Regions:
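Intrinsically disordered, low-complexity terminal regions
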Residues: 1-264
Length: 264
């Protein structure tokens, strides 16, 4: 009997998770204000994800052109358009967008300001604005744009550019920016304190800040099997902004690294 009650409770919880999914492909997900950033995970394949903030506690997920309001044909309306699936996990929400005829629709999220994000897509862009939390974003074929974000950022793109502007940094957590074929363009507040690790294999490094560079130097290795002592060259540049602070790593193979100072 207890087992049946538990299963019934789980079903009720799942049903209550999504308050409403209207004809425009819009899902409202109630969340509680626990005093800690909410965590949202999204994994897409052929779609882009856009995240904006609002003052409420709900998470709103939208896909364009979905639902029974699709265009009519011969007096009939299509009702099998792709939808949004939400799974509540221990550390937050996992949001997915269904495939239809081999295609996946772009996803737009409206979230509370204090939200942590884990966003991944293979063929698509990632665009986030105004979020304060832990932001971890990855795209294979697309660009990453993070505007007026705060907290910590781990961002990577294989075939795209990174453009990031940060209002505040979490001094206790490192930052990482990487791209194989694209520029890395990051704007920090003028009073940022950071220790930098910089590497642009086939590009240039530019900065508005006065960066105190430290020697790259040689890193000692070990004896090989034939008795030769191997020395590994560290090709990274190391430096500090405003005396050093949060650890920030930048790496691009075919692109530039640009570090801007935000205007006051």
């Amino acid at each position: 009997m207890k087992r049946y009650l538990a299963l019934a409770g789980m079903l009720l919880a799942v049903c209550a998770l999504a308050r409403a999914q209207d004809s425009a492909g819009r899902l409202v997900i109630p969340t509680r204000d626990t005093g800690t950033p909410r965590a949202i995970s999204v994994s897409l394949v052929h779609a882009s994800v856009t995240v904006r903030t609002h003052s409420g506690n709900d998470v709103i997920a939208e896909t364009p052109g979905a639902g029974p309001s699709s265009a009519e044909r011969d007096g009939m309306r299509r009702i099998d358009a792709p939808g949004i699936a939400v799974e509540r996990q221990d550390n937050g929400l996992r949001i997915q967008v269904a495939f239809h005829n081999g295609h996946q629709r772009d996803l737009t999220l409206t979230v509370p300001v204090g939200t942590s994000l884990n966003l991944k897509t293979i063929h698509g862009d990632i665009d986030v604005e105004g979020v304060h939390g832990e932001i971890d974003v990855t795209t294979l074929h697309g660009n990453v744009t993070l505007t007026a974000v705060s907290g910590t950022v781990v961002a990577s793109s294989t075939m795209g550019t990174l453009k990031v502007s940060m209002d505040r940094l979490d001094p206790a957590k490192p930052l990482s920016f990487s791209s194989l074929n694209g520029n890395i363009d990051v704007t920090f507040p003028p009073d940022v304190k950071a220790n930098l690790k910089l590497k642009a294999d086939r590009g240039e490094i530019w900065s508005d800040f006065a960066i105190s560079l430290s020697g790259a130097g040689l890193q000692s290795g070990s004896h090989t099997t034939n008795g030769v002592y191997r020395i590994n060259l560290d090709r990274n540049l190391y430096g500090a902004i405003n005396g050093g602070g949060v650890e920030a790593s930048f790496h691009t193979v075919n692109g530039k690294i640009l570090i801007h100072k935000r205007s006051k």
